[in-house]
Amino acid sequence: LGWEISLTTTAVLAMSSTISKLGWGSGAAPKLISTIVVVGLVVVAGIFGYDLIMRCQQVITIVTGVITVGFFILGWGHIDFDAIGRIPSGGLPAMLGCCFFVMTGFGLGWVNIAADYSRYLPRKSSNSGIVFWTTFGASIANVLLIFYGLLLAGSNAKLAENVGNDPIGAMASILPIWYLIPYTIVAVLGLMSGSIMDNYSNGLALLSFGVKLPRTAAAGLTAALTVAGVVYVTFFSDTFIGPFQGFLTTLGVPMAVWAGMFVTDVIVRKKDYSTPDLYDPNGRYGKWNVKSFVILAVGTILGWGLVVNTAANWLTWQGYLLFLIGGKDGSWASANLGVIVALLVGLFGALAFQRGDIAKQEADLPASETADAIEAK
């Protein structure tokens, strides 16, 4: 839900910025129109289901790639390597903070969506193939875009500041007018495609919790929450980057713990889960995994104590353990160490306390079939 709000807000800001630049409106009107259009399309596509989403994704991916190459070419003239060379080097805490923030945004922030993609993969898909192609496909665009964005931000301090308020609109400001419209359309569609998948995923998540709602109603409920978040960030927040950073660091910590436990489960568990037992409160897996909840709580408490976000006033309570490494004003405060600490707590906590439980669960289960065996059938 947080990612749906973030992506939808970015799309709304991009569209409203373009409307204003083209002289088609001013004040709150462009934001209001953009909110109605973007949220409406996200809701419609999310309600109609997976097939429509996949059709949208395929087309948007191809067109976005072409438009992005054009952006690289047209924006190259705005890169000033002399200005970049004059930027002083950052310290180790700043570098780690940047790395962990990117890790949270492009890795940990999306780990829970894996089920939505993997459940549509053929059973014959190999584990190594899934890991490699998912990692490669998810990383290559991010590496290129982040590197290019750093060059642009280092060349123009004003542009770097504007990106924090309106990421897509700021990037569009360096483009010629004739390229502005196709660039904005494709950027908005790309952001919306992620929001569409998130909206669909949110609806399924509600249903999996036992909420008695039709899938369309569940998608509509998450859309209403998205509208509330978009309206807050668009109309009442001074910047986009403040709430966005707050969202990533606050939710990234418990997600890191969960991801660590999940990785341990993948490493240690040698057999497939028993599907009937997963749906049986009295089955081999039980109704509650108390150890997992304890590990999650401990990792989250430690992680939140080692992150700080001065851009969001509602998160000033975080960082209560930073006094151990120089305080909230020290150089290590912005290192986002809480994220990696949370990940390690989840990983090693599960290794230490759940290995025996997994062995008991697998005691009388048949061996898992390999991808080759499944394909042979």
List each model region and its residues.
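Hydrophobic transmembrane alpha-helices that form the core helical bundles
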Residues: L1-W24, M192-S208
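Transmembrane helix-loop boundary segments of multi-pass membrane transporters
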Residues: S17-L32, Y50-T61, G169-I177, P182, ...
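Transmembrane alpha-helical segments of multi-pass small-molecule transport proteins
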Residues: K21-F48, I62-I73, C99-A114, I185-V188, ...
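Hydrophobic, small-residue-rich membrane helices and short re-entrant helix-turn-helix hairpins
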Residues: F48-T61, N112-L144, L159-A170, D198-T216, ...
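Hydrophobic, membrane-embedded alpha-helices of multi-pass small-molecule transporters
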Residues: F72-H78, P88-L152, I174-N199, A259, ...
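A conserved active-site cap/scaffold subdomain adjacent to cofactor or substrate pockets
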Residues: I177-G220, A224, A228
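C-terminal catalytic subdomain
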Residues: P214-L278, Y285-S292, V339-L347, R355, ...
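C-terminal membrane-solvent junction of multi-pass transporters and transport-like membrane proteins
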Residues: A259-F348, A363, A367
